Regions:
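C-terminal helical cap(s) of enzyme catalytic domains, especially alpha/beta-barrels
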Residues: 109-129
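Conserved alpha/beta-domain cores
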Residues: 1-105, 109-111, 123
């Protein structure tokens, strides 16, 4: 929520309403960031109170399993949160469900994603220097 507040402050300073996606840590992995699903209501209310923030949807990542089918329940829960989020905002405002990366985007799409992040599939693995 502190990040939302900072974005709101900076957007307000330049007279902008910033579109954002709320990131949820559905899998509960310690290596992932994001809002825990049990903090959903608190996060939604905090976002709605910020005048320079426009929530457009949510994003989440599944753990990397050896068996891709194990990602399906995570993406399914992401879709459920997305539908719940849609009910909290004006009709049409929540329109992005970003789930799935280069290795698991097919299952994410099957489970309702309408935005995927496939940079590695397009550009290759990152080279860290």
């Amino acid at each position: 929520i502190s990040i939302l507040q900072e974005i709101d402050k900076r957007a307000g300073q330049i007279g902008k309403v910033q579109d954002v996606l709320l990131e949820f840590n559905i899998s509960g992995e310690e290596t992932k960031t994001g809002i825990e699903p049990d903090a959903f209501e608190e996060a939604v209310e905090a976002a709605k109170a910020l005048p320079n923030i426009r929530v457009c949807g949510l994003m989440c990542m599944a753990p990397q399993f050896g068996d891709l089918e194990k990602t399906r329940p995570v993406f399914r829960e992401g879709h459920e949160l997305y539908k719940k989020l849609q009910k909290k905002f004006p009709e049409g405002q929540i329109h992005i469900l970003s789930m799935g990366m280069s290795h698991d985007f097919e299952i994410a799409i099957e489970e309702g994603a309408n935005m995927v992040r496939i940079g590695t599939a397009i550009f290759g693995a990152r080279v860290y220097r």
